[in-house]
């Protein structure tokens, strides 16, 4: 690892606690499996299987010219440089966003991890333990109603199965699309709406200008990072304010605000 950074975002449910730090296995489209480990501020990547390149990561910093809300700028600059890995698996990104719909962040992580442990591919780790990936679309399609219900996922059964069927048919094409085009394609799938499509593509591409930036997570952490600022209370007004405030820095401002939340709480 040669990146210079101060903070690594581990908000995705696939990051799991391990020996006082965090770890995540990335499943790449070329068949490679990579283990990312974060411990004592040190990030390491180990190839577990396959060949090909490492999972892609991007570094974000607060723009020097950003001064629209000084209190917010100060909070975000306290993070320093922030690293976030792109979700290498579009199917995982879709499934994660579906599980995250309309439930609390902490609960969505519990559901995601239990679902992975029960039905996901088990990847052997160097320490002798194993790591469970998100269940493949073929597996999801084969699960019974009772299997969903046993993990508290009954209300996610239909959207996950619809997404799995669509991914098996269109996934190869989707992975080649530009992020904004992919958003429209995803919304052609039953039960995938704007929030899910935008959140999925942001996770997959790290293009956070496409994230639904007026959602509860951004509103919550913007208000906590800059409590003295008079933020609009309702979602549409906040979205307009946020877009105007960010200008050309919408991607970095949104990601860094979520990173600030990741450092100070649980945003899912």
Question: Each predicted region: which residue ranges?
Answer:
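HhH-family (HhH-GPD) DNA N-glycosylase catalytic core used in base-excision repair
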Residues: 1-268
